[in-house]
Amino acid sequence: MKRKYFSILLAAMTIAASANVYAAPSIGQIIPEAPKVVEGNLSNKQELIVKDVDTGAYKDKKVAEVVTKVNDDNTKVNMNEILKDLKVDTTETIKTNTEKKVNPSLYESLTPFVDLVIKEDDKITYETDGAIKTTLTIEAAKDVKKKDVLLMQIDPTTGKVAFVAIEKLDKATGEVTATFDSLGPVMLIEKVPVVTKKVSPEKYADEKVADAAKKLKDQKAGFTLTDFIDDLTDTENKEVTLDNGQTINLDDYVSASSLIDMAIKMSDDYSYDMSGSLDAQVNCDIDSVDWKSL
């Protein structure tokens, strides 16, 4: 029988990795200038401002808990944890306010949360009569790419999470323009790269996956998919049905490379904790691939 070859074998694990930790920056350090309203239904007495978060004013207590945890200098939290705490269904397609598909678990925070609110005299409100298009100057937005950043905003009354697209970005000044359908806590998030690297079984949360990877981590191309899957399942059935409905036999597939990790590169660490789906092109070290078998 002619054997089919798979170019790489990816081990899927779940392990939490840390996001950025903040040294309690002031609101002036995060957003040094007052927002400029481009479009919005505000009265002459109303002013759009940013201020330190006031979690005690949030009607949704879960939002208050999440914002407090993210802004805690002594707490390390990644986006996947934030999404789970806010009960964001990552099995469903998530889109920005401009209807662009996005996987927020592949982002990390660049700032802590700050409150975007309307001030009228001495009164602060988190409610708005329609969308507000505004320009914000964000220090962390300097020298970033527009396509890689979003604003994550949470409605403190309903708990609804929005991923707000950046419409304009001045990399020199950090000035961003975006449209908000609601007000409340907001932070800047940036897409993180998904990379391939040498396997690290010691970092895997799943012991079965770790044990299987340890057995194969030093083996070069030529092992079967069965060699890997056998240690992960309690069945001897070699037939597997893929998501597209196709049924394959594990013994028909042989590795054309050594085992590698696909991981999320976050700050100075790696994370395997991803929700949703990912379309990716995977690059391998040329020395690890058996090109003659392809």
Predicted regions and their residues:
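Hydrophobic core
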Residues: 13-18
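C-terminal beta-strand-rich structural cap/linker in extracellular carbohydrate-active enzymes
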Residues: 176-197
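Surface-exposed loop/edge segments in extracytoplasmic proteins
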Residues: 158-166
